[in-house]
Amino acid sequence: GRFSLYIPGEKISEIFGLDEVLRMEPRYNVAPTQLVLTIVEDRGRKPQVVQWGLVPPWAKDPSMASRMINARSETVAEKPAYRAAFHRRRCLLPANNFFAWKKEGGKSLPWCFKRRHDKIIAFAGIWEMWEREGHVIASCSILTTDANDLVKPIHHRMPLILHEDNWDRWLNPETNHLPATALKKELGPLMQAYPADDMTAYRVSEYVNSIHHDDPACLEPAEMEMF
């Protein structure tokens, strides 16, 4: 997966209710293992920059991060690598859009997905701390779910996007003490595919395929109509 986050930092602070005014460079092609912005709950919402690709505390080394960029929402509460983070360290990841690739004629063709009216996206995430011999890594995974009807023709999975009304419920630290079954019952209703009718999609050029490209050209439509 890849995504973009180019909205000005001060706007992110306003939308997510952060006391701190963020200063950020626009990113148009955020890729796994790179640093990403997360929003956590710590006596109020706080920004936290972490590596995208979760490293469990028990991992011998951080090399597994590239395989841990996504956590399936259906099993996140039980998987050993994710369950502690799901219980105690949930976060939001702001984005303007995400990309998915469709296999077609031996090629991978990139598509861009947004919320309607360019509203901000908040991915549901979990985060962890890994430490060995003074080397500390904060890292995260983005939850995924079955794709909605808009994304499904391109890819069978999609990031778990939370509506603004559910941000507090996802971050709520008061649910951290709940038994696994109770927590899953509390958060389970949030773990549904975001409504297709509140999203738009268009194909972008293969320029975005290279992680070395990180500029507005990543969002340029390919030679086809939006729908």
Predicted regions and their residues:
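Short linear sequence motif anchored by a di-proline
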Residues: 1-227
